[in-house]
Swiss-Prot record:
The chain crosses the membrane at residues 5-25, 30-50. It is a multi-pass membrane protein. Belongs to the UPF0391 family. It is found in: Cell membrane. GO terms for cellular component: plasma membrane. It comes from the Bacteria. Keywords: Cell membrane, Membrane, Transmembrane, Transmembrane helix. This is UPF0391 membrane protein Bcep18194_C7021. It comes from Burkholderia lata (strain ATCC 17760 / DSM 23089 / LMG 22485 / NCIMB 9086 / R18194 / 383).
């Protein structure tokens, strides 16, 4: 349990560095691009799963 607390604390520190620095806008753009890529991958795998039945 303590291990997870330390991991989430480190993630929070990294997020704070990006959020309070000037990098937030660039990271948001990258996140948007990755979101759409993963939505497309999800839809493709969903369709492949339906077709294989």
């Amino acid at each position: 349990m303590l291990r997870y607390a330390v991991i989430f604390f480190i993630i929070a520190i990294v997020a704070a560095v990006f959020g309070f620095g000037g990098i937030a806008a660039g990271a948001a753009e990258i996140a948007k691009i990755l979101f759409y890529i993963f939505v497309v991958i999800f839809l493709v795998t969903l369709l492949l799963g339906v077709v294989r039945r």
